[in-house]
């Protein structure tokens, strides 16, 4: 018979493995063996055990007023299948399948891999999964909670009572599991976790949940992602063979909650179905090649943009807190946490067929003293400031992603001079495919924010990035970070009057697309947002009724089209062979010119930029050969709300040596304008 201490610990939910007490057991009593079935049914007035097949009933005795029942079956020593017959306070009877009648589900091999930190498909094992066990349909729950003394599954199905569905811990792994019969997709649940720390009790969302409630609610939802049937095999195979380093990449960065809203319905967000029908056609029409979605996992604070998550952080505040952002830091050095993070990355690739992943704030991971004062951080074992655990995690993440999913990109937002971020790990790099060029972004925005009269003193801000442009596989970015927190929108950063602001912005975009490196625009830049980005409201699409904004949008579309169609603008982004200065030394007039070349050097474009509002007539630049040079883009065209200063569609090269080249073009340069020429 059950001991009083055991009963009390079940009733007060203080037993780490309830299967040791609850369910069916062969017991010894008085020197003889019997079968005992025990159940904790807080809402039952009476209970009985019903044998499957024979239908034979065995009454259960209440051993505790809170609902602990036991049936000791004399004359039987066999473990048999049964159901629990429960009679509630209203005398209503129901037949239930005992969740404590099932054997463990996670295999020893699964547990070994989880403990080792190499179970990279954890999302198929941990979390909530519909399954059939011994012919019984239900949901299997599993979670890693190493510092818990008890974990329970709670939900509407048990009135959020953490005593009813206590989970079993699997040895010393810290993994808790339970199969609950009768549950199915759509069930709302949480884990109730009792901590070793003073018995602290907390409700937690499932870190492996496939679906979550909308804030302010925070429960997880059982969902079966495998019900969706993919039809993209052709793309998935083609992706493996795609050389993204030589392909056009013009990325449109999107925050789905504020790209567009429905004002007629209280400013609600668009659904994913609505986004598929509106965002995808828009991006394709604008000529962008990729979309970068800011974090899409459900999050309780809209203003966090989806970055602020919790769980599995360092216990040491010298490692586990990022004070600048008020966020906690994952415990990179623990194998199970590193496994969780890598498995999470693979989840998006496996279940959602995502084509790339960007890792945010990599610098804060790499450096132990990142934004910390002396005394606020602990050196590594060599006395340095490098976070060796984070470095190891990043390298392993990249190796596994690239190994399992050829053709998938990994991108680092890394703001320091850490070397070889986008170089393979076997060459000593971190293994990312590409890296955001934060230095270029800072320099270029500082330059464009200057009044043109002072730009001649700061031309190095335009040209300095070319000194290190080929040390990494860079993406040139104008991201969300530059249009928030008082930094102003891109258009509002531009100096000058109304016309000059638009001219400067077109010039900025032109210079960006002409430089080596892939490209990224944050949403709203293409229509000339006046206000900073606000995650709680839509972009100002109404601006497109005004000519300057509509024509700016048309310019970005044409710029994207040119970028995609001209190999010289994207084939050789990461080596010096694709770029050649014509002249960067005309500081006095703030003019620069250069050549971009394709893999075939004979395929090239000539770029000329005038960064002042002064028209320059008869301005000569050297070119590699004679013939006619067609003007394929003019940012000052009347089509884009410019002054329409140009070169009548192109110019013939003169046999006049200039800039150490055999021929030259005599050009009229528009104010705050960019010109692009292609030889016939």
Residue positions per predicted region:
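Feature marks short, surface-exposed loop/turn motifs that line or immediately flank catalytic pockets
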Residues: 197, 258-260, 297-300, 363-365, ...
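Carbohydrate-interacting/catalytic domains
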Residues: 1-248, 272-283, 287, 498-502, ...
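Substrate-binding/active-site clefts of carbohydrate-active enzymes
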Residues: 209-214, 227-228, 233-251, 255-386, ...
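Conserved structured core elements
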Residues: 269, 335, 339-342, 356, ...
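Conserved alpha/beta catalytic core and glycan-binding cleft of carbohydrate-active enzymes
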Residues: 215-216, 353-355, 370-536, 564-621, ...
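Glycine- and acidic
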Residues: 312, 330, 380, 490-494, ...
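Hydrophobic residues within beta-strands of alpha/beta enzymes
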Residues: 47, 151, 291-293, 357, ...
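Alpha-helical packing segments of well-folded alpha/beta enzyme cores
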Residues: 278-279, 337-348, 393, 397, ...
């Amino acid at each position: 018979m059950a001991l009083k201490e055991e009963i009390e610990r079940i009733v007060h939910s203080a037993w780490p493995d309830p299967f040791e007490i609850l369910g069916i057991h062969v017991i010894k009593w008085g020197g003889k063996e019997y079968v005992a079935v025990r159940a904790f049914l807080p809402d039952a007035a009476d209970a009985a055990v019903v044998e499957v097949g024979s239908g034979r009933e065995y009454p259960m005795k209440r051993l505790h007023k809170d609902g602990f029942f036991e049936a000791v079956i004399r004359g039987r020593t066999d473990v048999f299948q049964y159901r629990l017959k429960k009679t509630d306070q209203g005398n209503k009877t129901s037949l239930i399948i005992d969740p404590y009648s099932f054997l463990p589900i996670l295999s020893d091999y699964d547990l070994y891999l989880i403990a080792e930190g190499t179970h990279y498909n954890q999302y198929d094992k941990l979390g909530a999964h519909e399954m059939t066990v011994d012919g019984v349909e239900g949901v299997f729950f599993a979670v890693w909670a190493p510092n818990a003394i008890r974990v329970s599954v709670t939900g509407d199905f048990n009135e959020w009572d953490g005593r009813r569905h206590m989970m079993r811990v699997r040895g010393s792994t810290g993994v808790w599991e339970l199969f609950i019969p009768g549950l199915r997709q759509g069930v709302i649940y949480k884990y109730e976790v009792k901590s070793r720390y003073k018995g602290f009790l907390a409700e937690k969302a499932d870190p492996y949940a496939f679906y979550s409630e909308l804030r302010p609610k925070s429960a997880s939802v059982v969902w079966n992602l495998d019900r969706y049937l993919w039809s993209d095999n052709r793309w998935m195979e083609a992706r493996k063979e795609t050389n993204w380093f030589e392909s056009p990449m013009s990325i449109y960065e999107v925050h789905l909650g504020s790209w567009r809203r429905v004002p007629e319905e209280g400013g609600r967000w668009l659904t994913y179905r609505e986004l598929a029908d509106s965002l995808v056609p828009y991006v394709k029409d604008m000529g962008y090649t990729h979309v970068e979605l800011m974090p899409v996992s459900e999050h309780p604070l809209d203003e966090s943009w989806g970055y602020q998550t919790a769980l599995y952080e360092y216990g040491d505040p010298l490692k586990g807190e990022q004070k600048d952002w008020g966020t906690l830091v994952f415990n990179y050095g623990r194998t199970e946490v590193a496994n969780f993070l890598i498995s999470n990355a693979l989840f998006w690739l496996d279940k959602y067929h995502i084509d790339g992943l960007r890792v945010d704030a990599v610098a804060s991971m790499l450096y132990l003293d990142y934004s910390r004062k002396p005394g606020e951080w602990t050196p590594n074992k060599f006395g340095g400031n490098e976070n060796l655990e984070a470095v190891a995690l990043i390298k392993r993440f990249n190796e596994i992603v690239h190994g399992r999913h050829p053709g998938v990109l990994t991108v680092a937002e890394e703001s320091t001079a850490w070397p070889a971020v986008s170089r393979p790990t076997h060459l000593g790099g971190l293994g990312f495919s590409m890296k955001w060029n934060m230095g270029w972004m800072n320099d270029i925005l500082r330059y464009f924010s200057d009044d043109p009269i002072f730009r001649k003193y700061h031309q190095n801000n335009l040209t300095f990035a070319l000194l290190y442009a080929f040390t990494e596989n860079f993406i040139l970015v104008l991201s969300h970070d530059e249009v928030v927190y008082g930094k102003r929108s891109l258009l509002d950063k531009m100096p000058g009057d109304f016309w000059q602001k638009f001219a400067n912005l077109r010039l900025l975009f032109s210079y960006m697309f002409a430089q080596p490196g892939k490209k990224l625009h944050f949403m709203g830049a293409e229509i000339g947002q006046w206000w900073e980005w606000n995650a709680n409201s839509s972009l100002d699409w109404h601006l497109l009724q005004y000519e300057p904004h509509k024509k700016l949008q048309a310019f970005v579309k044409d710029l994207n089209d040119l970028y995609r169609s001209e190999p010289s603008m994207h084939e050789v982004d990461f080596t010096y062979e694709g770029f050649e200065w014509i002249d960067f030394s005309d500081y006095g007039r703030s003019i620069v010119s250069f050549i971009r070349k394709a893999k075939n050097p004979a395929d090239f474009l000539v770029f000329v930029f005038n960064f002042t509002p002064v028209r320059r007539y008869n301005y000569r630049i050297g070119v590699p050969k004679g013939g006619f040079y067609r003007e394929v883009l003019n940012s000052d065209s009347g089509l884009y709300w410019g002054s329409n200063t140009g070169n009548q569609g192109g110019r013939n090269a003169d046999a006049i040596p200039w800039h150490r080249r055999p021929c030259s073009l005599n050009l009229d340069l528009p104010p705050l304008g960019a010109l692009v020429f292609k030889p016939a």
